[in-house]
Amino acid sequence: MAKAKFERLKPHVNVGTIGHVDHGKTTLTAAIATVAAITSGGEAKDYASIDSAPEEKARGITINTSHVEYDTPSRHYAHVDCPGHADYVKNMITGAAQMDGAILVVSATDGPMPQTREHILLSRQVGVPYIVVFMNKCDVVDDEELLELVEMEVRELLSDYDFPGDDTPIIHGSATEALKGSQEKYGQPAVVELLNVLDTYIPEPERDIDKAFLMPIEDVFSISGRGTVVTGRVESGIVRVGEEIEIVGIRDTQKTTCTGVEMFRKLLDEGRAGENCGVLLRGTKREDVQRGQVLAKPGSITPHTKFDAEVYVLSKEEGGRHTPFLNGYRPQFYFRTTDVTGAIQLQDGTEMVMPGDNVEMGVELIHPIAMDKGLRFAIREGGRTVGAGVVANVHV
């Protein structure tokens, strides 16, 4: 049992395969798990077990996703692979599988294809911070110049979307050969090289506890003789008794001081990321605070009404709308704990949005909400979810 405990001490990093259909994402996922099992222990996975991705729900949307775990000597990886293009779109927009870095799989025989571009754009929009490239099927390309040409195209495409194309690691290999156990350069050695690149190129992600304090307010109580208590789950950081905090969103930002933290009816010195707690606020009246606001470290987050978003619109089969919507559509946007009405501005050239589409749009809310790039939300109509989105940019 001691071994399992030791594994947990390794830093944990979330990655995933992205890229065009049939370029070899699932085969590469199986090859990585197999090679990592040989080099660092763990469970080898075959193609079939990864390909039969189970359904899961995120923000009311059904997504097919496979989760594979593997180790390198220095890290533990959780890797997500999706069977279909629509699953990738949904996964990235809902944040069901947040990625610290992505492995872009590009077939050397085809070069970049439409979904290659779309997945790079999505990565930029939803805030995937790092991309590494695995050029697959190199074993069937005889012409070295063709490999160089494809590599150049991939680098240009990454640069088009503000990724550092010139400095991105690109590994040439063959997932099929690696899965067969080949020791040729495109076989298992290429996957070993990919694992090294993941370890060195993708930095260790900042843990929630090390980020600035933020707690979405779920409920507000007034306790006689003590003052106002707000409850919620701490999203990030730590709040300590005696610290100054801000109440952000919906109304003008207010400053207050945390005079107590309670969890399970016990008084604590601090509330930490992941914990459900009550925070006692000095001098704040019950009617000055409401669900949908957040408590935050002063200056760490600002309220906005206007933002750009990347949105996935549910299909009719997923319980979404049966009809398209047009410019000026006014649904509710559900951020963290509350709904806020907002108007949608479609991009020039987009007349309407059909159920099942993914689309970039501008939004203007009727109340400001504490937000940053990367914040997820649901779009609702009369309490049912009709879309999911992520903030791509905020406007001051």
Swiss-Prot record:
Region (G5): 174-176
Compartment(s) where it occurs, according to its Swiss-Prot or TrEMBL record: Cytoplasm
UniProt-annotated binding residues for GTP: 19-26, 81-85, 136-139
Alphabetized GO MF terms: GTP binding; GTPase activity; guanosine tetraphosphate binding; translation elongation factor activity
Stretch list, region G1: 19-26
Reactions catalysed: GTP + H2O = GDP + phosphate + H(+)
UniProt binding sites for Mg(2+): T26
Keywords: Cytoplasm, Elongation factor, GTP-binding, Hydrolase, Magnesium, Metal-binding, Nucleotide-binding, Protein biosynthesis
G3, as annotated region: 81-84
Residue numbers spanned by region G4: 136-139
GO cellular component, one term: cytosol
Residue intervals of the tr-type G domain: 10-206
UniProt subunit comment: Monomer.
Entries under PANTHER family matching the protein: ELONGATION FACTOR TU, MITOCHONDRIAL, ELONGATION FACTOR TU-RELATED
NCBIfam families according to UniProt: EF-Tu, PRK00049.1, PRK12735.1, PRK12736.1, small_GTP
Role: GTP hydrolase that promotes the GTP-dependent binding of aminoacyl-tRNA to the A-site of ribosomes during protein biosynthesis.
Family: Belongs to the TRAFAC class translation factor GTPase superfamily. Classic translation factor GTPase family. EF-Tu/EF-1A subfamily.
Protein known as: Elongation factor Tu
Originating species: Psychrobacter arcticus (strain DSM 17307 / VKM B-2377 / 273-4)
Top-level taxonomy: Bacteria, Pseudomonadati, Pseudomonadota, Gammaproteobacteria, Moraxellales
